[in-house]
Amino acid sequence: MMEEDIGDTEQWRHVFQELMQEVKPWHKWTLIPDKNLLPNVLKPGWTQYQQKTFARFHCPSCSRSWASGRVLIVFHMRWCEKKAKGWVKMRVFAQRCNQCPEPPFATPEVTWDNISRILNNLLFQILKKCYKEGFKQMGEIPLLGNTSLEGPHDSSNCEACLLGFCAQNDLGQASKPPAPPLSPTSSKSAREPKVTVTCSNISSSRPSSKVQMPQASKVNPQASNPTKNDPKVSCTSKPPAPPLSPTSLKSAREPKVTVTCSNISSSRPSSKVQMPQASKVNPQTSNPTKNDPKISCTSKPSTTPRLTIQQLSVVSPPAPAPTCVIQMPSPTPIDGSRAADVAKENTRSKTPKALLSSPLYVPPTSSYVPPTSSYVPPTSSYVPPTSSYVPPTSSSVIVPISSSWRLPENTICQVERNSHIHPQSQSSCCGACCESWCEIFRYSCCEAACNCMSQSPLCCLAFLILFLLLWYLL
């Protein structure tokens, strides 16, 4: 590790200014080395702070080097609130070589890490004594040093001891060398006490949504080992041990904690959350475990019933297939006397163009649709159609269908259109000629012709000949 000479005070000043700017950026503090500074000799308005540190020395005569962990550093501090300025005087006491006859005092060399730690401790004292700030339990930062130093302190060659300020006196707990960490071999002989915590059973008799906090329960003064049949969950952990000296490793005892919890049973489904009850801790047990740290966990599955939720799919009944029936009335009125004779209709099924383009259209099986039983003959009193009735102008009827509406699947549409209605007695002749006759006269009324043909066969023959002549001429 790189070491700095105390004679080069720029390193000390640089670190000190950085620390002060972090806590008091608007105040000005100055660090002044003073070789004539004496401990416990203070001027009015000044306070003192002293600390021991580790340093290395080099003899200027024989070039011999040595290290010491009893190097005394003294600080005198003063703060002027009116001027917003502060001053710190510092002195590091030196040592001399014990091999030379009349050696001079050598300047100590302090490592960079220890310089930072010493000035941090000084900053705490400034906040506490000058600004009346800080915490009551604010401790000093321990310093780093070589723990392999052996032998007593050479007080005959120590500057502080020669002046009467012996550095061997305890100046604070932070100046003691830090203890080395525990080695694996030295921790085997340490025995740890065992602490057992037992929790009682917790049961639930009815559903509830309450949350219960831990309750205190009594524990026997001497806890015995739990039986194997009892369900339990035991956890044993070993916290890290604090640094100890090699001489005190044998007597070190580490605590050991064992937590035992019983089952949580429920007779009915419940949303109640219960926590194990707290219990008193027994510092002594009958059977301690092994010396090595361990973590053991033993658990038994809980008997709490589980609720299974199965999501059922929604079954929707199939929609009935709608039937669209459009029946156009005859443009000519029908007398009441002829209503009984109208039993059969020679229909001509013509499907609207909009329905033909639909993929759900089912064509009718026959163009002829016989009259159903739901036919109601008109009464004797004829009621003419109202003004709201609009007769169709074309033989093809187009049913307006909204673009946003589509027929559901399996939809059957049937369109009926009645042609000219003829009496039942005229069915023999109309079946042969009426359809062609209507096409020639562009669906004009052929009632007179049908009446004539119904009177005599000769009249029918005459009309047939006339029809052929007209067909030939046209």
Curated annotation (Swiss-Prot):
This is Receptor-transporting protein 3. Residues 1-453 are cytoplasmic. The lineage of its organism: Eukaryota, Metazoa, Chordata, Craniata, Vertebrata. SMART domains: zf-3CxxC. Interacts with TAS2R16. Its main location: membrane. The chain crosses the membrane at residues 454-474. GO terms for molecular function: zinc ion binding. Expressed predominantly in the liver. Not detected in the olfactory epithelium. Keywords: Membrane, Metal-binding, Transmembrane, Transmembrane helix, Zinc, Zinc-finger.
